From Swiss-Prot:
The gene is mfsd11. Belongs to the unc-93 family. Keywords: Glycoprotein, Membrane, Transmembrane, Transmembrane helix. Its main location: membrane. Glycans are attached at residues 40, 163. The lineage of its organism: Eukaryota, Metazoa, Chordata, Craniata, Vertebrata. Gene3D superfamilies: MFS general substrate transporter like domains (1.20.1250.20). It comes from Xenopus laevis (African clawed frog). SUPFAM superfamilies: MFS general substrate transporter. This is UNC93-like protein MFSD11. PANTHER family: ET TRANSLATION PRODUCT-RELATED (PTHR23294), UNC93-LIKE PROTEIN MFSD11 (PTHR23294:SF0).
Amino acid sequence: MSPESRKLLNIVILGVGFMFMFTAFQTSGNVAQTVISSLNSTSFHGSGYTSLAIIYSVFSASNLIAPSVIAVLGCQMSMFLSGLLYSAYIAMFIQPYTWSFYTLSVLIGIAAAVLWTAQGCCLTINSDERTIGRHSGIFWALLQFSMLFGNLYIYLAWKGEINISDTDRRTVFIALTVISLVGSVLFFLIRTPDSDSAQEDEASDSVADAEGSMSAQGCLSKAMDAFRKSLKLSITKEMLLLSILVAYTGLELTFYSGVYGTCIGSMNVFGTDAKSLIGLSGIFVGLGEVLGGGLFGLLGKNNYFGRNPVVILGVVVHFLAFYMIYLYMPSDAPIASRSGTDLSAFINPSKTLALACSFLLGLGDSCYNTQMLSILGSLYPDNSAPAFAVFKFVQSVSAAVAFFYSNYLLLHWQLLILVIFGFFGTISFFFVEWGLTQRSLYNSM
């Protein structure tokens, strides 16, 4: 197998592993608040929004140490151990207790930081300037198939259900736990690519497992060096500009993965289908993600226009979705009580309109995330782990803030925040992309 084919295979395995893990985790996140509201146990007093806020708060702080962990453990072991904690969090829903719910929310925040930083490192090591766009799209498309499978089951199993029974909850989360474990094991199939340059020789050190006779002092030195690189990289001009758009991706991640599905489920106008529509909404978000990731993956190798047109498509698609959501969804939908909301907005809601907005949210998200993965890999090929750690740090901080305010803000205020960050984040991305293009032209002269 040629070196390029081996790298492509690694990307496919990486994407499939994440697909299994996040089939379980994203489905859990989409239905967490609904499941918790339906719990019969009087001893459980958790909040899905609060749990997600804890996850992303810890996630953001843990990104500062994630490169150090990866420098010591290597990418494969880091992703595997993180996957085990993801599985433990999902398994907790089989028989939830308030203490285990919030404890595992903290642990999975740490695991997420290590997992996503290792993913960015693995993606960069298996790519170059010519293939980074294609590989980012392929990985993103495979990852977002996770939005389809779990949510399809939720839709079929919970169709017509108003409250989720203990039996249904246990059945779903046992299956999701097994699926998550399968994804974790797949990471061991990734092989370190053959190095064809000094740059890859250096980068491959962060992918190989930390085996052999590395001393404790050597581990500490390696960890501290990775930490210092993260701090230095976080204050570069390019990273500061990109941070605005990165913050937006965190805000809209919260919206489509946690808030929007809950809003649909709280609308009494949808009747007995409201709960099953949560799963169907997740499916349509996934369809948009897969379409975008697949399309940009195919175009990535032959994209002569750069990343800006894709980001423009993302902002147009998202703003259209926000406008339609504002028109049809009642303002109290995100904070409605267990009995739901009977309020109306400006136009009559319909299932078709709700699912169309779900699709647009997914398509727009794929536009932003594929291009962020691509531009970070191009800007920081020698410092991929610190770069992706900073990316995930900013994204998770904004996601945590969004999960906190989702408990209190009416829908129209949440949409306004998204529009403001989306607009200015897109402008900042343009400046970084133009600077990178000029640098590439200068180096080619």
